[in-house]
A protein has these predicted regions:
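Hydrophobic transmembrane alpha-helical segments in integral membrane proteins
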Residues: 1-13
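Hydrophobic alpha-helical transmembrane segments
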Residues: 4-6, 37, 72-74, 78, ...
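Membrane-interface helix-loop junction between the first two transmembrane segments
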Residues: 16-35
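Portal/gating segments that form or line small-molecule/metal binding sites
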Residues: 39-112
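Loop-to-transmembrane boundary segments
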Residues: 107-119, 183-204
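A contiguous pocket-lining binding segment that forms or flanks enzyme active sites
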Residues: 112-167
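Membrane-proximal soluble regions of multi-pass membrane proteins
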Residues: 160-195
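Juxtamembrane boundary at the C-terminal end of a transmembrane helix
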Residues: 209-225
Length: 225
């Protein structure tokens, strides 16, 4: 369990410190592109270490929320699939070049109308789902670490984009929201289904089925029941 705790701490500190407070100094010395490449490699290594440590950790039960929590977990994964697929769009300034997207008067479209961080919300719901369905210490360390990084990432990206793009980012942020559907509820935007598209709905549903039926083969635990 100690190794898993170290791996979880390393994963969190990598994202909170290296991608946070230390990023300007490091990127200033090696360049932004080199930093992105280095951080991607370090993230992959850290995630691999985290997963490896998790698989070798003994089972220590903490809670059992019953079958209702399992069904809720499946619903959250289903929603996460739609968020993940919807985030993979060239109109997402957090994935594509923000300068190209933010130059438009109305850059928020598709799922970005719902939240400006659909991918990180997908990881958030995915992590919560696994915490609901796996009430043990190892799961808490693994999925808790992923949850912390995903939630912190939303605020970190907002701060970073504001520093880089100033008024252009503020205008974009005013059209959307960090919390899903908040901008729509406040009348600052509206959801347009055709911008999400039937193709993405089909892909999201297919992804969910692949995750459900492939879970037993890859992870060794059947979740289709």
């Amino acid at each position: 369990m100690t190794i898993l705790a170290i791996a979880a701490a390393a994963w969190i500190l990598l994202h909170l410190l290296v991608a946070g407070a230390l990023r300007p100094a490091i990127a200033g010395r090696i360049g932004e592109n080199a930093f992105r490449g280095l951080f991607s490699v370090l993230s992959a290594i850290s995630l691999g270490f985290l997963i490896w440590a998790y698989r070798g950790t003994p089972f220590v039960p903490l809670w059992d929320l019953g079958i209702g929590a399992v069904h809720m977990a499946k619903l959250l994964v289903f929603i996460a699939c739609f968020l993940l697929v919807g985030s993979l769009t060239p109109r997402n300034p957090n994935l594509a070049g923000a300068e190209l997207v933010l130059k438009d008067t109305l850059p928020a479209e598709g799922l970005i109308r719902v939240t400006r961080h659909p991918m990180l919300w997908a990881f958030t719901f995915w992590a919560i789902a696994h915490l609901l369905a796996n009430g043990n210490l190892a799961a808490l360390l693994l999925f808790g670490a992923i949850l912390v990084v995903a939630l912190n990432g939303m605020y970190s990206i907002d701060r970073k984009q504001h520093r880089r793009h100033g008024a252009a980012w503020d205008a974009f942020a005013a059209q959307t929201s960090l919390v899903p559907f908040l901008a729509i509820a406040q009348g600052r935007n509206r959801f347009v289904f055709r911008e999400y598209g039937l193709a993405r709905v089909i892909i999201a549903c297919a992804l969910f089925l692949i995750l459900m039926y492939g879970h037993g083969y890859v992870i060794g635990r059947d979740v289709t029941g």
